[in-house]
Amino acid sequence: MLIVTPEITYLPLGMGNIANKLSAKAGGMADVSASLVAALFERGVDVHVALPHYRRLFHVEVADLLDAKLERYNNSLHSEDNGEQRIHLAEDRTFYYRDQVYPNYSEDSLNMGLVFQREVINNIIPSVKPDLIHCNDWMTGLIPGYARRCGIPTLFTVHNIHTQDTTLEAIENHGIDTAVFWQNLFFKQMPQNYEESRHINKVDLLTSGIFGAHFINTVSPTFLHEVVDGIHSFIQTQIQQEMANKYRAGCAKGILNAPDPDYSPLTDSSLAAKYSPENQTEMKRVNKIEFQKRTGLKVNPDAPIFFWPSRLDPIQKGPQLLSDILYAIIHDYWHKQLQVAFVANGAFYDVFKRIVIKHNFGDRVCVHGFEENLSRLGYAASDFILMPSLFEPCGLPQMIGPIYGSLPIVYDTGGLHDTVTHLDIGRSKGNGFVFKHHDAQGLRWAIDQAMNFYSLIPPVREAQITRIMKEGVATFNNDNTADEYVKIYEQMLKRPLISDISSMQTPITPIL
């Protein structure tokens, strides 16, 4: 099978000669793609990966590529089983010299997406000859339509509801022959014929991926139902309708992502002190002190820390809810030494900086740009994770937090609904604090609930944290996620992915 993704965090070393050099991340898709590929590879699945060749990001020199190609050639001379290269890089100078995965301008981003798909359609698919293709988001949206024309079943994963549109003419000018599969694409207006559609009638790339695929999935069950039911007005009508069509045809599912196994307080090298659920009380204090020193917060291991690890994006992530009440919660819980820590980039970064300066909150509130190691330390140091997202296709911080003993505070939506349940100490259930009204007062209520929990006697509080950590490790893991994807793959193929799997799932009839 072939997984097509514009970004990935890492690849298993056994997949190719330069696998250890390939890392390009812009968001959660990179982590999810990496974890899924690793899980499939470890199970013995014949998995191949196609991604752009971000030469500068990969720190790959031309000499490395020549050495890798020469080694593959030599292997082919001496062995029938030559350790087949499973990594397929889309080659074009459009990718070579980038400092980041996605351009800042939509036109440049569109060009990059079309070039990537050209290489996959014209070169990589014919070379790999996959039995099944797994595509991800709008930058792979043309591929399901092409694959359908070739008789290759395709799974299309919607990580983000962002899309782009363009004409057949523009697509063809990038070297993709749409004349052979244009009927499998989704147009802004109902197409009459190829010639009529070619110049004016634009193709929607994300919706084309949904329309052309044999099966689709979102990255949480609740977000799928929210889209199908039209809960979110900002989702474009054509996207909502096509996802609803797939759902009603029995060809859509929500599959929760999971954090990478590397997120573990037992092994995380970014921590000042590693720990387990059994010794978390003492070791989290060590990490808290180190985090406070590095961020300029007042050093106090008894201070409750509320940690913001996500983008400061007011459209999705809800930082404006916190900015409205930040002064009030610091003031009202001054005697409790409450601290708030941001390790994130985004539009509201300067907003929080100004609040800190205006009220001289420098030792109570830190605003730090995103840094991977500091963010990981933040999970270990903090007591609560702030995620008041208006919508959330999946989300990962609310799953990482419990694994590190930091309880999430979330709005009841999408993947947050699927992963966080309100804490019920009496029944020893739940793993966080959930508010139902997306406004500042709703968030304030949840923070108050968290502070009530923090004020409990230590034996009661620590017992709940230990339970939540253990449940987090058991629940939020990549084996569970990979199992769900394997079920879909096998249903689409109507056979096991690997030969030693004896049981088969009930087949899903592909949409023809």
Model regions and ranges:
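Catalytic cores of nucleotide-sugar-dependent glycosyltransferases that transfer UDP/GDP/TDP-activated
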Residues: 1-512
